[in-house]
Amino acid sequence: MNKKSLPLMALRDMVVFPGVIAPIFVGRQKSLQALSHTTVSEEDNSKYILVTLQKKFDQENPSKHELNNTAILAKIIQIVKLPNNTAKILIEAVARVKLSNIKGNDAFEANYEIIPDEEIFDVNNMRSLVDNAVQLFSKYAINDKKVNAEIIETINKEISNSTNFINIINILASHLITSLEAKQHLLEETSPFKRITTVISTLTSNIVNSETEQALQQRVRKQIEKTQRDYYLHEQMKAIQKELDEDKSELADIEKKIKSLKLSKEAKEKAESELKKLRSMNQMSAESGVTRNYLETLLSLPWGKYDNSKIDINQAEKILNRDHFGLEKVKERIIEYLAVLQRSSKIRGPILCLIGPPGVGKTSLVKSIAEGMGRKYTKFALGGVRDEAEIRGHRKTYLGSTPGKILGQLKKVKTSNPVMLLDEIDKMSSDFRGDPASALLEVLDPEQNSHFVDHYLEVEYDLSNVIFIATANSHDLPRALSDRMEKIYISGYVEEEKLQIAKNYLVPKQFKMHKIKKDEITISETAILDLIRYYTKESGVRALEREIGALTRKALKQILADKTVKHIAIDSSNLEEFLEAKKYNFGLAEKEDQIGSTTGLAYTEVGGELLTIEALAFPGKGEIKTTGKLGDVMKESAMAAYSCFRSRATNFGLKYDNYKDFDIHIHVPAGAIPKDGPSAGCALFTTIVSLMTKIPVHRTVAMTGEITLRGNVLPIGGLKEKLLAASRGGIKTVLIPEENVKDLKDIPPNIKESLEIISVSNIDQVLKHALVETPINK
């Protein structure tokens, strides 16, 4: 197309799009000069002018370099002269053009070339996009109420013409609420698809902003109306209260309560000070509500209130034996604790902490202690507590502040000397809000807890009469907290103990819970043993109780569904008719002695477990690889076991060439369960020796113990739990460190009778008992 030349006018507050009719007020001298230089076109007898946005909007006299090159060829429809040498023109944007050779001092003039839009190939897609844009524009116009209804009507007419997509895009673009730079960028874009996409994006943003603004205005309006309404009601209430003199009556009750309670001197002074402050306040103010809540909380605490507990250790022992089977050493220590309390009204000894796997009766023991002492029982669950304000309370300055849970529990039981269970004390954690374990130090320390200060109360409260007893699954407690406690370890139950607990406690409890009559259902000992062996795998009896409950419900359902059934007897022969198939295998996992596979013993938070350790050798560089989600300590045990093996390889009839070209892969199933701890050295060493010498390991032998590089066996913890696991797993022989022999006195006699327990002091003795034949060649 041949280039043409026309006068050029700079705009600083608008961008005009093709097909749009727009008014322009002309006041700058250069713009007036450009307008005066326009001439009538020979083609249609009309005047034309070029208009473009200047780059700097605050520039009064922009140079030619400060003008955008993409402009509009506009047809002048009307010129109206105004006072003060200004004018108003009405233009119709004809086409988008590219400017070149801009010149002129008094007025701009430029050559131009019309810029065509890219051709639309995908008409259906464009129609869909344009429809979407028009719908969004209609929604925006309705919400914003700034767009003339005639504009919407014009667009709706244009949409009916499927070939006029470009005009619709231009009309929509001209009414967008966006920056001038964004509109100029939209004008410069030649792709219709990119332009309509930008229009849709901007309209969506405008709608969101408009809706947000309307919602905010509505919320502010409602808040203002509510505030005015509340003020009116409060003034009315205040007038009524003034007439009835209710305020004086309420404050008089608070004053009477302060005088009647056995408050400490500090607490009484604080209460009187707050009451005095409350009298001088506007009763409808926020501050009076805070002060009133504080006084109510302060006066609701059990100041000087104590249960008349008379400890009788014989009666307490009967209660413990009634509620718990076995646990003789634990009950003996509790009775000793109560004996000291019976003789001394205040105890300065350590806090008891019951540590054991889930379901062994830790919580119920604390309830029995409270009953045996004749005191109320309360529980503070510490599992998942991260905020020290849960212990010490929130300061009054915070909105909705309350005292800590310690004082909250005392307020609940209405006594200052309950038995308080601090449950799951090992499950606390810390974050940016503080360390609750450190906050507990003041609560549990007998030298400090008589002067405990809650952040909310801001006065001392005596906690020295509260009996705190903690429970935990793991002995891994913060050092400072651990030093203030006496740990009592509760091991898991053996099979015989579980049987007795089920017969004497769990079955009657479930029958009572489900309203089972005595002659309706009977559960034999063989059925209970099958439940223990094949449906549960735990140190406690929690899962066993659930299975008995499920068994009871299914039997009850059968009785109620079939009126002819009067009695159901459950034994091992029909157990699976009521429950699902057996969940666990009872006995040995391996049917034959295996090479490179050893049974170890592990101690976890849920009790003892059998730990299978297996290994394979394959060509490599003499390295060792471990898998099974092992911790750092266990990985180091594997390295130590391998080094010990290599140092003794010649004793096993192996030459250096037998293992230097082989890598060993040690795996401990199951791979998803984390494993760590210093007690797997013997099992790791035995696995490696069995693998390299091709001598099987006795499948009936399990072992525990760490080893040194010189082959000495070191002592371990959790012996009782490990032996219980060995007994449950069908193990016949257990190898334990020689230094752990002293711990056998705590093992139940039936466990010691069911297992051959052999003490070992070095790895030669381990191999002698673990392997099918001795590999050592003297």
Curated annotation (Swiss-Prot):
GO terms for cellular component: cytoplasm. The active site is at residues 679, 722. Its main location: cytoplasm. Keywords: ATP-binding, Cytoplasm, Hydrolase, Nucleotide-binding, Protease, Serine protease, Stress response. It comes from the Bacteria. Induction: By heat shock. It is found in: Cytoplasm. Pfam families: AAA, Lon_C, Lon_lid, LON_substr_bdg. Residues 6-207 form the Lon N-terminal domain. It catalyses: Hydrolysis of proteins in presence of ATP. One of its GO terms (molecular function) is sequence-specific DNA binding. Belongs to the peptidase S16 family. PANTHER family: ATP DEPENDENT LON PROTEASE FAMILY MEMBER (PTHR10046). ATP-dependent serine protease that mediates the selective degradation of mutant and abnormal proteins as well as certain short-lived regulatory proteins. Required for cellular homeostasis and for survival from DNA damage and developmental changes induced by stress. Degrades polypeptides processively to yield small peptide fragments that are 5 to 10 amino acids long. Binds to DNA in a double-stranded, site-specific manner. This is Lon protease. It comes from Rickettsia felis (strain ATCC VR-1525 / URRWXCal2). The lineage of its organism: Bacteria, Pseudomonadati, Pseudomonadota, Alphaproteobacteria, Rickettsiales. The gene is lon.
